[in-house]
Amino acid sequence: MATLFLYSNTFSFFFITLVSLALLILRQPSRAASCTARPVIFNFGDSNSDTGGLVAGLGYPIGFPNGRLFFRRSTGRLSDGRLLIDFLCQSLNTSLLRPYLDSLGRTRFQNGANFAIAGSPTLPKNVPFSLNIQVKQFSHFKSRSLELASSSNSLKGMFISNNGFKNALYMIDIGQNDIARSFARGNSYSQTVKLIPQIITEIKSSIKRLYDEGGRRFWIHNTGPLGCLPQKLSMVKSKDLDQHGCLVSYNSAATLFNQGLDHMCEELRTELRDATIIYIDIYAIKYSLIANSNQYGFKSPLMACCGYGGTPYNYNVKITCGHKGSNVCEEGSRFISWDGIHYTETANAIVAMKVLSMHYSKPPTPFHFFCRR
């Protein structure tokens, strides 16, 4: 695998900023101290928050250089390091979420489980690993955990209790694949946006099912700017670009989806009055990274660090990151996009910092709200 895009200004303002970010995200005793109960998190989603489920469930090869930074090895994450969900867990001083499908090791999922699988959509609902299937997996997980916890006094405390499930945080980050696949099938913009109400309905139904299982605290991420992904830009011959070089139609569809998701959260706050529903504007955060990339020390914000093809996007669907012939940049910290679809650890760290700031949550809520008693 070749290496390209060398940069020498290692001690730039960006790296000073990055150190500050690390301190903010990973060393926040005030946040951790606010958790008076053990944090329990259940996550549902796609590759943006998959911490190894695709590899564990299907044996799909996600090899090096994925994971080359923090983990120093591939862990099944589609990034050079940590994902947003990893930084959020670390902000609470809790261990990183293990994939539900990863049965190896001695984990008992005491701090929750991750049901997210790369490539997962909301529709069709009965195809692995759609959101519907992930919620069914959770139902089985909960039932089995409570069964084991009640089977022996010696096992009490080793598994999540009924109160643990009730007080847990339920995170959902899904919908991107539904929109992207519609465009990939050749559907027009109008055909794609007609699917959005169905997608929103399925997400709402899944949240209500989790509520029926006892969940009361929900953390909902909207989708990012699809039209700014190097993968989409490299495959679509279009002059329909905005001032930052992103595809207007893709981003417009994502924006309409996000508006529907926001409205859904408003409805759920009325329908489920004893539940807390937090909506996070991930789109605004990620688009700001691209629009203000120089301020964050990024170069070529629409170019993948790992891929093939060089400028302007370094993405080729036939030679993707980690495959024979692909290249990888030396300093991923100068790139927003890792592989043309997913973000670098550096970009994820900045996204996490902004999520934790409460400026992008509706209503403004600290991430640790669910583990305060």
Swiss-Prot record:
It comes from the Eukaryota. Glycans are attached at N93. Coiled coil: none annotated. It is an enzyme of class 3 (hydrolase). Its EC number is 3.1.1.-. Its main location: secreted. One of its GO terms (molecular function) is hydrolase activity, acting on ester bonds. It is found in: Secreted. The keyword Hydrolase applies. Gene3D superfamilies: SGNH hydrolase. One of its GO terms (biological process) is lipid catabolic process. Residues 1-32 form the signal peptide. The active site is at S47, D339, H342. Pfam families: Lipase_GDSL. Keywords: Glycoprotein, Hydrolase, Lipid degradation, Lipid metabolism, Secreted, Signal. The keyword Hydrolase applies. One of its GO terms (cellular component) is extracellular region. Belongs to the 'GDSL' lipolytic enzyme family. This is GDSL esterase/lipase LIP-4. It comes from Arabidopsis thaliana (Mouse-ear cress).
